[in-house]
Regions:
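Short phosphate-binding/catalytic loops that engage adenosine nucleotides
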Residues: 44, 100, 234, 332-333
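Hydrophobic alpha-helix position signal
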Residues: 95, 213, 229, 277-279, ...
Length: 367
């Protein structure tokens, strides 16, 4: 098919990602289609990465559990990758019904190449030749997030937050002018607004600070996706689906000082096999591949103790002893703490009121 007569190949390329809550049902998919068409009509080439419809991935996992107590990871990938394929096809249909040419691609069809770790693969290369060809024809390209193909031609999935990583990887490979991550929150806040009433929406934030918050439990972006954005240097905007607000720009220098706190009650504490100088109560695991700090995103199954954590992000926290002592005072008695280049993490036992600690840390530290 030839490009539309009014198509300009020099139009800016925009990569958008929509999460499952934004695509929860047919009505939500129709609303996203309206948003995509409006953006095309403003003079942009669009690549849209989609997650599975809200709740469908968990439903597929439960379905697998009804069939097998220990399903093979390869077969889980074959099953779980279908969720995003449903969404991509439905959204492509909805856009086409509005008079805009669209085509859907799986992760493998759009050139997402991964390693061979089933259910938790990592992207090693992106070859978006077909995506570029369809953009040149004036079509909107819909991509199934969360999945790719290994170098041995096996279907793989990227683990939780994989659709975010798909969008950022495609934006980098395409040299996109803009990348936008849409979810059900307005952007990045200085704390979880559900437990901190005066949490502030941040206009901008740096890569490292966002990654620290994500590893501490902030849900605006998965930590692996935040790490990918930092390594690739891909600036993006975190926005709420359907909102007119501009959200948070991620990738600029960010704000000075201490900018935010986050918390999690789903971390695993792995007892250190040996002490590390300068790190107290550090989450550490030693293996043949080396020493890993921060167990939240370790790959594979490792033994650990469930614990709660609180994270404060900002460079001033680590260079100003007063700020450090304030943080430790407001979260005491913590069981242990450890530092990263952009923030400080504290660990607590299972009986700790993590929401109250989050409010206290926010009131004490966030400027």
């Amino acid at each position: 098919m030839n490009a539309p007569s009014n198509f300009d190949p020099n139009q800016p390329t925009v990569v958008q990602k929509y999460g499952g809550s934004s695509l929860a049902d047919p009505a939500a998919i129709q609303r996203v289609a309206d948003t995509v068409v409006e953006r095309v009509q403003q003079g942009n080439k669009l690549v849209v990465v989609v997650s599975a419809m809200g709740g469908s991935t968990n439903a597929l996992i439960e379905l697998a559990g009804q069939i097998s107590e220990h399903p093979k990871r390869r077969e889980l990938d074959m099953l779980l990758s279908t969720g995003e394929r449903v969404t991509m096809a439905l959204l492509s249909m909805a856009i086409a019904d509005r008079g805009i040419e669209a085509i859907s691609f799986t992760g493998s069809q759009c050139g997402i190449i991964t390693n061979d770790v089933h259910t938790d693969a990592r992207i090693i290369d992106v070859r978006p030749v077909r995506v570029e060809d369809e953009l040149a024809r004036g079509r909107v390209v819909i991509v199934a997030g969360f999945q790719g193909m290994s170098y041995t031609r096996e279907i793989t999935t990227l683990g939780r937050g994989g659709s975010d990583t798909t969008a950022l990887a495609l934006a980098a490979a395409l040299g996109a002018d803009h990348c936008e991550i849409y979810s059900d929150v307005e952007g990045v806040f200085s704390a979880d607004p559900r437990c901190v009433r005066d949490a502030k929406l941040l206009d901008q934030i740096g890569f490292g600070t966002l990654e620290t918050l994500a590893r501490g439990g902030a849900k605006v972006l998965h930590a692996d996706a935040a790490a990918w954005a930092r390594r690739a240097g891909i600036a993006f905007r975190a926005r709420k689906t359907g909102s007119q607000e501009t959200g948070t720009l991620v990738g600029v220098a960010g704000l000075e000082g201490i900018v935010a706190v986050s918390s999690s009650d789903q971390r695993r504490f792995l007892q250190p096999e040996h002490p590390l100088d300068g790190l107290h109560g550090c989450i550490v695991y030693s293996s043949d591949q080396g020493t890993v700090i921060d167990s939240q995103n370790l790959h594979g199954e490792l033994p650990g103790i469930a614990c709660k954590t609180l994270t404060a992000a900002g460079e001033d926290l680590l260079c100003d002893p007063k700020n450090l002592s304030q943080f430790l005072a407001c979260v005491a008695p913590c069981q242990g703490w450890w530092a990263t280049p952009f923030g400080l993490h504290a660990r607590f036992d299972e009986h700790t009121d993590i929401a109250e600690l989050t409010r206290r840390a926010h009131a004490t530290l966030v400027v």
